[in-house]
């Protein structure tokens, strides 16, 4: 991730993040604060710029997140919808024990209390996500394997399966349909 990239650039091993929170809370706060110069803020800015570029080019994208902030997801869905995108959600669920175990084996280990609170928030949000995405929402369980490589492969398989299915389906968003129609008219007018 961009956050991990900037941590490494600052000379910090992402695996040490949980340790830093416990042993050097001031540094942890400095790294993760909303200060525009913080590692977290710079990473968020880069992510936002990349997303903007994709949206300007009307390119498809997969947005990966924890889902602990339902308002953020709802806002992203609304913004994308206004740009003509059809939006879908693959909700990859796991047990808390598995989430904690996987976290301990990640390159960037988060403090256990953050993982636990985030997991609880996500579980509370499942129903709301179903309301927001309606028929464009699917839940898959990825709790049965702890090995990070296997879990990542399974996750990728799930996402690819649904992303391929949805990408091949006709555009439903009226603004998206209009944009495609205009692009085809431009293409035809240019004789291509």
In which residue ranges do the predicted regions lie?
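Short loop/turn segments at strand-loop or loop-helix junctions that form parts
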Residues: 1-3, 92-94, 141-143
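Conserved substrate/cofactor phosphate-moiety recognition/catalytic segment
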Residues: 1-59, 71
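PAPS-dependent sulfotransferase catalytic domain
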Residues: 42-56, 70-75, 112-131
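Loop/turn-to-beta-strand initiation segments
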Residues: 57-61, 86-88
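Conserved phosphate-donor/acceptor-positioning beta-strand/loop module used by diverse small-molecule
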Residues: 68, 81-102
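"Short basic amphipathic alpha-helical interaction patches in structured regions
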Residues: 74-80, 104
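Conserved GTP-binding G-domain of TRAFAC-class P-loop NTPases and closely related GTPase folds
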Residues: 96-192
């Amino acid at each position: 991730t961009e956050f991990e990239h900037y941590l490494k650039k600052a000379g910090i091993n992402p695996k040490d993040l949980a340790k830093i929170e416990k042993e050097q809370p001031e540094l942890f706060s400095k790294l993760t604060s909303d200060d525009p110069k913080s590692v977290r803020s710079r990473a968020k800015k880069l992510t936002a710029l990349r997303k903007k570029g994709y949206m300007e080019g009307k390119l498809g994208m997969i947005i990966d997140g924890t889902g602990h902030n339902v308002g953020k997801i709802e806002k992203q869905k609304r913004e994308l919808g206004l740009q003509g995108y059809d939006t879908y959600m693959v909700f990859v669920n796991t047990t808390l024990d598995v989430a904690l175990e996987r976290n301990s084996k990640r390159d960037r280990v988060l403090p256990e209390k953050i993982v636990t609170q985030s997991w609880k928030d996500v579980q509370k949000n499942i129903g709301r996500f179903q309301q927001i995405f309606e028929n464009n929402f699917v839940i898959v369980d990825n709790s049965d394997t702890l090995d990070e490589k296997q879990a990542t492969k399974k996750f990728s398989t799930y996402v690819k399966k649904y992303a391929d299915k949805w990408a091949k389906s006709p555009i439903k968003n009226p603004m998206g349909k209009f944009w495609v129609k205009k692009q085809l008219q431009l293409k035809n007018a240019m004789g291509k």
